[in-house]
Structure formats: structure tokens, C-alpha cells
Amino acid sequence: AEIGWTDVTKLAADRRTLNLSDQLYRSIGSISANVAEGFSRGSRRDRARFYEYAHGSAREARDWYYKGRHVLDAEVVDHRLRLYSEIVRLLLTMIPEQRGASLSEPGPVYEVDPLNLFNNVPLS
């Protein structure tokens, strides 16, 4: 959630995106919280359930960033869309490992270079 703090602050400053900023902050905070809670669960089934919640929150965060594109800098939005797409991809690997099934995300395919997501992070 730390990376989104300045983004949420910028969105909250614009009356048109005040509600969007709250939804974005909740969704990005929910990702790590659900991964942490899932990791602490004793059964694979419980772990998978919390990873699925995190997956939904990551998709939601990505959607809120897209909707906030008119207020946030284009470079920031591009980075966050790629970052949350990578998180979705990682969770789609983690969930089947716990469930024993396969999942995949349908297009559009976002090009993501995971090594560059944390270098020169743009801030709003």
C-alpha cells in the first residue's frame, strides 16, 4: 500500500476522484493483508482462499488506477497498471499451487518486466 500513498493523496485532492481514492486505498491495502493472512493459514484450502481475495483486490486496484488516469500522471498510471498486472500474474501462480488447479488471466496482455517495476518508481 505504500507505493500508492502519494497516488491516493493526489486523487483525494480532486473532488471528482475523492471516492475513487478511498476505493483504491482499500483495494491496495487488501492485497498484502490477504496474502499475509493466507500465508499464516494451516491448510492449503484456506491459504488459496485468501490468495483469491488478494487476486480480486489486485484486479480491483488495477481498475481504479485506470479510472484515475485523468488525474494521475500517465507515467504513474502506466507503472501501476504494469505492477498490479504482475501481482495478478504471481497470484495466479500461487493459487493453483494451493488448490491443485490451473488459472490464467484473459487478455489484454500487459507487457511487464518485473525487474524494472521497482527501479525509478514514478510518484504522483
Q: Predicted regions span which residues?
A:
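Short, C-terminally biased terminal segments at protein or domain edges
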Residues: 1-124
